[in-house]
């Protein structure tokens, strides 16, 4: 009788070999390149038109993505209304907005103090006070509104632009001038005796083209990107209102990041001082091109500018007082910082 050999392995051995094979397969699979962890999408918004200011805001957007060390995919998008953009961030529909202090005043009215006409005796004074104190002043105010202040970007100084030259306050008096909804705009033009016509930004450009208004005020690097550069080709360098912007994040979205990611983002952002320097350096060649294209830049002297200052500055305390106690405190803190320089 022939003896047959069983080809079946003992059950225990089969189980051991099966487990070993499964382990090897898992190890091999882990070593294979697979899909990267999904990045969270963050949208960064501002109202910047094509030009230097938009370039800055796109750089901020890219820096946020880079600083987060691969955790975020960032994209810049345009929203024409700063108030709308800010509300989108407050509600968490967008993650970051780059908004002027005037725009920020829609959620924290006292921040409009920074746009007070002729708040600073000189650009150098404003730079020093803002660089030393603004983060500490503005950060806690916005934190209470569900926003995290990450830093600042620059827009520049408002100047007067007009269809006909407006080189002195006397030439402004009685003229139909576009006044923005911001109290600072109403205060400035009211102090000069202008016939103010309130228009939102989007309606200002057709208003100038159609003669509804004869002048307005805007930062030069923004102005030249708009239709106003053609319809109101006279610019007087009054330098009356310094405009800068907060980079603000939705607080809940920010708190989802690790401390290392938050720190990386803050360090990756371009400094306000560097962006401010770029804006000011860009003005000279941009003005030269503007003049070559037929525009007129009226470079008034310090003595001529003082005529504007003397009509506006005395009304500052009463203007700020109308904003309420929080604004008065911020204004007083600014004055104390100016004196301490």
Language-model segment annotations:
Residues 4-5, 28, 62:
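N-terminal compositionally biased, intrinsically disordered segments and leader/signal-like regions
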Residues 3-4, 302:
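Surface-exposed binding/hinge segments that line
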Residues 18-31:
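Bacterial N-terminal signal peptides
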Residues 32-38:
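Sec/Tat signal peptide C-region and signal peptidase I cleavage site
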Residues 4-20:
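Twin-arginine (Tat) signal peptide motif
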Residues 18, 38-125, 133-134, 142-341:
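N-terminal secretory/targeting leader peptides
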């Amino acid at each position: 009788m022939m003896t047959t050999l069983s080809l079946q392995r003992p059950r225990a051995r089969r189980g051991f070999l099966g487990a070993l094979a499964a382990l090897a397969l898992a190890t091999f699979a882990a070593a294979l390149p697979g899909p990267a962890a999904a990045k969270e999408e963050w949208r960064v918004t501002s109202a910047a038109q094509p030009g230097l200011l938009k370039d800055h805001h796109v750089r901020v957007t890219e820096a946020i993505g880079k600083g987060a060390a691969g955790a975020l995919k960032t994209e810049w998008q345009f929203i024409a209304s700063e108030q709308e953009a800010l509300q989108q961030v407050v509600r968490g529909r967008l993650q970051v907005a780059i908004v002027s202090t005037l725009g920020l005043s829609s959620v924290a009215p006292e921040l409009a103090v920074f746009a007070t006409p002729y708040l600073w005796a000189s650009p150098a004074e404003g730079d020093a006070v803002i660089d030393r104190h603004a983060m500490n002043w503005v950060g806690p105010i916005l934190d209470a509104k569900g926003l995290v202040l990450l830093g600042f970007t620059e827009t520049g100084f408002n100047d007067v632009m007009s269809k006909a030259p407006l080189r002195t306050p006397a030439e402004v008096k009685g003229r139909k001038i576009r006044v923005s909804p911001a109290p600072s705009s109403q205060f400035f033009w009211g102090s000069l005796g202008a016939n103010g016509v309130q228009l939102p930004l989007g309606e200002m450009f057709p208003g100038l083209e159609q003669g509804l208004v004869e002048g307005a005020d805007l930062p030069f690097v923004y102005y030249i990107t708009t239709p106003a550069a053609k319809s109101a080709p006279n610019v007087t360098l009054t330098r009356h209102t310094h405009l800068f912007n907060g980079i603000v994040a939705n607080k809940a979205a920010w708190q989802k990041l690790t401390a290392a990611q938050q720190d990386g983002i803050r360090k990756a952002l371009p400094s306000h001082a560097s962006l401010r320097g770029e804006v000011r350096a860009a003005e000279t060649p941009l003005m030269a091109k503007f003049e070559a294209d037929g525009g007129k830049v009226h470079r008034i002297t310090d003595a001529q500018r003082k005529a504007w200052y003397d009509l506006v500055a005395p009304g500052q305390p009463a203007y700020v007082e109308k904003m309420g106690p929080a604004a008065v405190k911020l204004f007083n803190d600014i004055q104390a910082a100016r004196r301490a320089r």
